[in-house]
Amino acid sequence: ARKWAYTIKGVPDGQAEILVFEGNFHGRTTTIVGFSSEAKYRDGFGPFTPGFKLLPYGDADAVAAAMHPNVAAILVEPIQGESGIVVPPEGYLRRLRELADQHRVLLVVDEIQSGLGRTGKLFAFEHEGIRPDGVTIAKALAGGFYPVSAILAKAELMDVFTPGIHGSTFGGNPLACAVGIAALDVLIEEKLIERAAELGPHLDARLKAIRSPLVKETRSIGLWAGVELVPEAGGARKYCYALKDRGLLCKDTHVHTIRLAPPLVITRSQINEGLEIL
């Protein structure tokens, strides 16, 4: 994104800025953790790469106020997974797209957790009918069988890379690519995206029906949910351990939230069984 800003947009060298958001999680490289709003991810890894501005997630007005000629890109998760399945206000991504167009800024969407059917769409940004300039994907791209990641972007962005200036030792690994293609074939042929869209409302309704003084709120979209506990519950991790012993695998995140991400092949009866355990 910065190279695009210098070579295409004409931002003065060394002055490009990328807008990012509180509660973000984009990985664990030094540059990425440098703009995390979580101290535990940053501790012991500085000094960090400059040129990132941290803004409140879900607040499009804050993005509008942060715009200036040297902004290169907006990097955003359409739904924040690591923060506990935080869904932004309706229209948020559409407003970011409008602001990006208005100021000639790239809109880059991180779909590493939310993409490839998880929310009931191929990509979560489709819920708002937008088209980003760049999309990052991984995790489900190989169905959990092999490490593979990719970036999808418009030609104007990809063409700033010429042979020899950027790459990685195992980039284009043929085994990873073969596994990725097979996983995408399964996603389409077995209609797993449609399954997530069909079963998502059932999962949401069952979660909202939980009546417990320990539950602060539930949030879900497609087959992806967060159950946020009240502070008095003493944190989500001990409940995740207890649920594991009873046959339900889930993950704690941000201390108080139980995160559920069932496989897209799950059935309605299996959802019911899991929620009975919960």
Language-model regions, residue ranges each:
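Conserved N-terminal phosphate-binding loop of PLP-dependent enzymes in the Aspartate aminotransferase
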Residues: 1-278
